[in-house]
């Protein structure tokens, strides 16, 4: 990444996520986004963010706070400054995963914005979506929704080059006093085919470290269907998700 930042940490009384932000293709697209949401009768506001240009804020239909911007202070690339790589060596933020009380409605809203579904889980008895993974940048997903009480963030994810980066992280965490912060994994998801581990920071925020998914640049990509009762949809192999 060459943007000034992809994550902002602020001290507060309670752990929470204040908003999710997406960069658009041009300054004109910020105005198009404002017109798009206003045309739906949604309240919008312009907010000031450090190191960013004009930033639009809106709540999605279930109350998830979203922000859209184009301009951000750029930094020199660190891609080949290997001496600066530390820990798990994350290369970019990859996606957000949120709970939604109505996944069908969430998918329709984000589809109208230009997101496309790559994989989904459907409840065969009701015909409704249980979960969906949606993309913009050509990976498996930039945002995903799972049926549940919301708006609520399940996790953010960072992409790393190989599974060995995840193994290295686990070695470091297990020998520096953070073994109890390893929540789940390593394992491989059925959905996305990604190699993963979930970790918790001291405040309980969940982060997924993630690699080995696939590209979705084919415009004819057909969304992959998973049955809700398939136990390998969440975990192809590895420990099951905690309840």
Annotate each PLM feature.
Residues 13-20, 72-76, 146-152, 208-216:
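Short, basic, helix/turn surface patches
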Residues 11-101, 120, 129-134, 149-243, ...:
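Vicinal oxygen chelate
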Residues 7-9, 82-85, 143-146:
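Short beta-strand/turn micro-motifs at beta-sheet edges
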Residues 1-4, 47-50, 57, 98-140, ...:
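Core segments of cupin and vicinal oxygen chelate
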Residues 122-137, 141-190:
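A compositional/structural signature marking long, glycine- and acidic/polar-rich segments
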Residues 3-8, 63-67, 139-143, 205:
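Short, charged/polar, Gly/Pro-enriched secondary-structure boundary elements
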Residues 2-16, 24-26, 39-41, 45, ...:
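Catalytic cores of nucleotide-enabled group-transfer and carboxylate-activating enzymes in metabolic
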């Amino acid at each position: 990444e060459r943007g000034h930042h992809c994550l902002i940490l602020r001290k507060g009384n309670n752990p929470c996520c204040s908003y999710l932000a997406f960069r658009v293709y041009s300054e004109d697209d910020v105005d198009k986004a404002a017109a798009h949401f206003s045309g739906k009768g949604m309240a919008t506001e312009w907010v000031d963010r450090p190191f960013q240009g004009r930033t639009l804020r809106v709540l999605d239909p279930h109350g998830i706070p979203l922000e859209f911007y184009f301009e951000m202070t750029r930094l020199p690339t660190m891609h080949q400054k290997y001496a600066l790589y530390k820990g798990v060596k994350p290369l970019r933020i990859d996606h957000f995963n949120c709970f939604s009380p109505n996944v069908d409605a969430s998918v329709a809203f984000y589809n109208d914005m230009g997101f496309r579904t790559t994989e989904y889980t459907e409840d065969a008895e009701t015909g409704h979506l249980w979960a969906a993974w949606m993309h913009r940048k050509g990976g498996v997903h930039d945002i995903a929704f799972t049926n549940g009480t919301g708006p609520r963030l399940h996790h953010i994810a960072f992409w790393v080059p190989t599974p060995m980066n995840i193994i290295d992280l686990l070695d470091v965490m297990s020998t520096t006093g953070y073994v109890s912060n390893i929540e789940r994994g390593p394992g491989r998801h059925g959905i996305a085919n990604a190699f993963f581990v979930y970790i918790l920071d001291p405040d309980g925020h969940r982060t997924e470290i993630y690699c080995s998914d696939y590209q979705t640049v084919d415009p004819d990509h057909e969304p992959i269907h998973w049955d809700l009762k398939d136990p390998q949809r969440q975990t192809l192999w590895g420990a099951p998700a905690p309840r």
